[in-house]
A protein has these predicted regions:
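Beta-loop-alpha module in the N-terminal Rossmann-like domain of NAD(P)-dependent dehydrogenases
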Residues: 1-7
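A general structural signal for well-ordered alpha-helical segments in protein cores
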Residues: 2, 28, 81-82, 229-230, ...
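Aromatic/hydrophobic pocket-lining residues that form π-stacking "cages" and hydrophobic walls in ligand
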Residues: 5, 31, 258-259
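Predominantly a Rossmann-like dinucleotide-binding segment in NAD(P)-dependent oxidoreductases
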Residues: 10-17, 22-139, 151, 266
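Beta-strand scaffold of nucleotide-dependent catalytic cores
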Residues: 46, 97-99, 162-165, 188
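Short Gly/Pro-enriched turn/cap motifs at secondary-structure boundaries
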Residues: 73-76, 139-144, 166-167, 219-223
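Glycine/proline-rich active-site loop of Rossmann-fold NAD(P)-dependent oxidoreductases
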Residues: 91-92, 143-145, 172-174
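C-terminal helical cap and adjacent loop that interface with cofactors, partners, or active-site loops
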Residues: 148-150, 156-159, 169-277
Length: 277
């Protein structure tokens, strides 16, 4: 499907943009600048831990909870994180392997059961907020999308990457660590900080040698929405290439789908297919 979109885009001669809003968040733009200036040397490893504290509400109480509806949360949720790994390192995934399972949600409840009608609503920890329209029972029988995933990736250039995604954590944030030959850079979303640790600093007991304080930005998605809107207008009005290209979107989707194929085949290594232009 993505390749058909790319071919149509090329044939049309029109402009196309992918809305990867995380590329526009200040905390990740700072990380990208640190990496691109060579501070941590030649990149060798990239790790992402995604604590999806609202996974039940966002993905298991509506259509996302079935493979027929969403295929995999390595795609529906993970495409942003996979893209960030690609963007921060400047390399795409070549092959992946993954393990995952349905470790919290799903069960034996009727598929048509909704939280407002459930006899256990007063005692269920996963009951939907009364104001939320996503209120299907997250323990219903049809739920078959994995809620706990681990994926490893080999990127172009030999970079090794890992992506961990859990949808029943008590907190909600992302943690990225990028490691190079001279040091590493890591972010803390809850604290609004980026840490840099250098190999030659001889301060191995300390968390960081440099700490960047990230100022809160106005606008949705951590201040990304106004910036991505401006980037879109620059593309439409002036022909400027957007920060996230259609190819970037396709490569993130392809890696996520390959990860799902792997975890559903016992963790077999899957090659990420090349674009069929």
């Amino acid at each position: 499907g993505c390749d058909r979109i790319l071919r149509t885009w090329k044939a049309s001669g029109k402009r196309l943009m992918v809305g990867f809003n995380m590329r526009y968040m200040n905390i990740f733009r700072v990380m990208k600048e640190i990496i691109d200036t060579g501070t941590i040397g030649e990149l060798k490893a990239a790790w992402c831990r995604h604590f999806v504290g609202h996974g039940r509400t966002f993905y298991f109480q509506d259509w996302h909870a079935t493979r027929q509806g969403s295929n995999t949360l390595l795609l529906q949720k993970g495409s942003h994180d996979i893209d960030m790994i690609h963007w921060l390192t400047g390399q795409y995934s070549k092959r992946v392997a993954a393990f995952g399972g349905l470790d919290m949600f799903g069960g034996d409840k009727p598929n048509d059961l909704r939280c407002p009608d459930c006899a256990e609503a007063d005692t269920c920890w996963e009951v939907a907020d009364p104001s939320c329209s996503r209120n299907q029972c997250c323990f219903r029988q049809e739920v078959d999308v994995e809620d706990n995933n681990v994926m490893i990736m080999e990127l172009d250039g030999g970079i090794k990457a890992s992506y961990l995604q859990c949808h029943f954590t008590p907190d909600y944030h992302r943690n990225y660590t990028i490691i190079g030959t001279e040091g590493r850079v890591e972010n803390s979303e809850p604290e609004g900080k980026v840490w840099v640790k250098m190999r030659r600093a001889n301060t191995w007991k300390e968390l960081a040698d440099r700490t960047y304080e990230i100022r809160p930005a106005m606008g949705g998605h951590g201040g990304a929405d106004p910036v991505i809107t401006e980037d879109f207008l620059d593309m439409v009005l002036d022909g400027k290439e957007p920060l996230a290209t259609p190819l970037a979107g396709r490569m993130s989707v392809a890696a996520g789908c390959a990860g799902a194929d792997s975890l559903r085949s016992g963790g077999q290594v899957q090659e990420v297919p090349e674009v069929a232009w």
